[in-house]
């Protein structure tokens, strides 16, 4: 999983720090820049500086300051907005099923109210999933098990099995959807409040999701990707806050910083870092690394604002990622799904090289993003499995200061978040067993199927593959029909080329949209 800075580079087309292994030449051609600026939500942040020396320092990270806990300072996991899906990946013609913090929800477009709605994904009749239904000709959400229909407030409007001259059974409260959640759209994302109590009906008026203006700024270009990963929220969040894994877990894919050859201690170029972590309280914390300021806004947002300045250079490395006088923003929405599974929505924006995104298809940029996800996916899954019965603070040896943000997150989680996500008896904390590597590295169900760009590209490339196979057969038939040797040889050559092209394309489709895998030993 990429640290914020690396994702900035992973989606860049021309920055010198971006690298790809030679076997990924296609990706190398289409890398796409990312990201913008954010208004800092907190002022007057008290920072304690970590002078981090990753390779050699043998002392533990300095403890960030923690504000003394007040009785009301416990974090409530269900008193917050949660991102459900990016609007660009939702189809208004059908309902969409998602699971967030253990809650199964259905997201659908109510054309009467011109708004996205989020319901509990359960029909009150026989508990069938509404997300498997359809939007009927009157714009109602229809359960396809028995045809019951619901409006935008969850009221039942039609029960086909009810007699015309009988009692209006559809007006009963028991016929209504049990969970109708407050929802809104902000920064191009559909959000929901995970409590259907009527007292929260107008919660948006007093409590809005965290807003990042740059993502809606027309002077910035913005790219997004959503990926479900086979490890939990805690592992996902701490990995995004860890810059020191980038040269190793993502070697050959990208570089976090440009390290001087004279300063390299190994091939990958791990080096000392300077990280500052601010005061930790129930509202999260801030940190500074090189020329970027980062903010953790519980429970889901971790974002960074990158603005080059004189402090960009360190004695061992430089960070020429963003042009002078320009700004880039990287935003991560970390969404708990179930124990052992989480979802990441990444949004990157920048106010330079904005024309590139207009010419590079979105699915091309997702190729490099997905490769980054894959490169440390297995490491993080196994790490979580090993930590499931252990105390993180006692089991992990943290001798250097490069892990400052990771330690800060774990301290926040322990002090304010109850040590883990509150699943409210929906799940036990036990993790699911480890599936096969092929299932772990699945791209289709974890991304392609729910991505509007990649799903369309996958269908079109599959059609092209079939077309190439058909062309191969046509050329064979033409070769058999002609008598001129030169023409026959040409037809045979075209048949062979078409067949080989179809085989190559089949391999490309499989690795890009279905399953890629990753082997660090030969990178």
UniProtKB/Swiss-Prot annotation:
SUPFAM superfamilies, per the entry: Bet v1-like, ISP domain
One GO process term, biological-process aspect: flavonoid metabolic process
Rieske domain segment(s): 81-192
Reaction catalysed by this enzyme: salvigenin + 2 reduced [2Fe-2S]-[ferredoxin] + O2 + 2 H(+) = 8-hydroxysalvigenin + 2 oxidized [2Fe-2S]-[ferredoxin] + H2O
EC id: 1.14.15.-
Tissue and organ distribution: Glandular trichome-specific expression in leaves.
Entry GO MF terms: 2 iron, 2 sulfur cluster binding; chlorophyllide a oxygenase activity; metal ion binding; monooxygenase activity
Compartment(s) where it occurs, according to its Swiss-Prot or TrEMBL record: Plastid, Chloroplast membrane; Cytoplasm
CC terms in the record's Gene Ontology section: chloroplast; chloroplast membrane; cytoplasm
Biotechnology and industry use: Nevadensin is a selective inhibitor of human carboxylesterase 1 (hCE-1), a key enzyme responsible for the hydrolysis of a wide range of endogenous and xenobiotic esters.
Residues the record lists as binding [2Fe-2S] cluster: 123, 125, 143, 146
Sequence intervals crossing the membrane: 466-486, 489-509
Organism superkingdom: Eukaryota
Cofactor binding, note field: Binds 1 [2Fe-2S] cluster per subunit.
Pathway stated in the Swiss-Prot or TrEMBL entry: Flavonoid metabolism
Function: Rieske-type, PAO-family oxygenase involved in the biosynthesis of polymethoxylated flavonoids natural products such as nevadensin and salvigenin, aroma compounds which contribute to the flavor of sweet basil, and exhibit pharmacological activities such as anti-allergic, anti-oxidant, antibacterial, anti-proliferative, and anti-inflammatory effects. Catalyzes the 8-hydroxylation of salvigenin (SALV) to produce 8-hydroxysalvigenin (8-OH-SALV). Can also use cirsimaritin (CIRM) as substrate with low efficiency.
Protein name per its UniProtKB record: Flavonoid 8-hydroxylase 1, chloroplastic
């Amino acid at each position: 999983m990429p640290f914020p800075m690396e994702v900035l580079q992973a989606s860049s087309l021309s920055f010198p720090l971006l690298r790809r292994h030679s076997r990924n030449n296609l990706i190398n051609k289409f890398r796409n820049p990312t990201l913008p600026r954010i208004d800092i939500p907190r002022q007057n942040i008290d920072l304690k500086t970590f002078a981090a020396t990753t390779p050699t320092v043998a002392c533990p990270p300095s403890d960030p300051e923690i504000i003394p806990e007040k009785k009301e300072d416990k974090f409530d996991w269900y008193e917050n907005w949660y991102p459900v899906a990016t609007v660009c990946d939702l189809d208004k013609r059908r309902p969409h099923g998602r699971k967030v913090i253990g809650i199964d929800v259905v997201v659908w477009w109510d054309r009467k109210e011109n708004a996205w709605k989020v319901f509990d994904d359960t029909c009150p009749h026989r508990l069938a999933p509404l997300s498997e239904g359809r939007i009927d000709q009157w714009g109602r959400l229809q359960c396809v098990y028995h045809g019951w229909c619901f409006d935008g407030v969850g009221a039942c409007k039609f029960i086909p099995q009810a007699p015309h001259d009988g009692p209006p059974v559809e007006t009963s409260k028991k016929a209504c959807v049990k969970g109708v959640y407050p929802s809104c759209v902000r920064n191009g994302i559909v959000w929901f409040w995970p409590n259907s109590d009527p007292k929260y009906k107008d919660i948006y008026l007093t409590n809005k999701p965290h807003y990042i203006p740059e993502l809606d700024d027309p002077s910035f270009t913005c790219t997004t990707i959503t990926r479900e990963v086979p490890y939990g929220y805690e592992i996902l969040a701490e990995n995004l806050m860890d810059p020191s894994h980038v040269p190793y877990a993502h070697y050959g894919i990208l570089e976090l910083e440009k390290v001087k050859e004279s300063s390299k201690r190994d091939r990958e170029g791990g080096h000392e870092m300077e990280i500052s972590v601010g005061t930790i309280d129930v509202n999260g914390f801030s940190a500074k690394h090189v020329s970027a300021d980062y903010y953790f806004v519980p429970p889901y947002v971790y974002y960074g604002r990158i603005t080059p300045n004189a402090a960009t250079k360190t004695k061992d490395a430089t960070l020429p990622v963003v042009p002078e006088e320009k700004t880039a923003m990287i935003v991560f929405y970390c969404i708990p799904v179930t124990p052992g599974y989480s979802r990441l929505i990444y949004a990157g924006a920048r106010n330079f090289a904005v024309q590139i995104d207009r010419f590079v298809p979105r699915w091309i940029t997702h190729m490099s993003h997905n490769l980054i996800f894959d490169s440390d996916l297995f490491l993080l899954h196994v790490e979580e499995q090993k930590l499931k019965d252990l105390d993180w603070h006692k089991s992990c040896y943290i001798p250097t200061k490069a892990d400052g943000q990771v330690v800060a997150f774990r301290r926040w989680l322990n002090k304010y978040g109850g040590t883990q996500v509150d699943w409210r008896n929906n799940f036990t904390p036990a993790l699911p067993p480890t599936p096969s590597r092929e299932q772990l590295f699945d791209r289709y169900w974890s991304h392609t199927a729910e991505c509007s760009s990649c799903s369309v590209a996958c269908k079109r490339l599959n059609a092209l593959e079939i077309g190439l196979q058909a062309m191969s057969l046509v050329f064979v038939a033409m070769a058999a029909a002609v008598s001129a040797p030169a023409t026959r040889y040409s037809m045979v050559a075209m048949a062979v080329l078409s067949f080989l092209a179809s085989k190559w394309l089949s391999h490309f489709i499989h690795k890009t949209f279905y399953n890629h895998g990753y082997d660090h030993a030969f990178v």
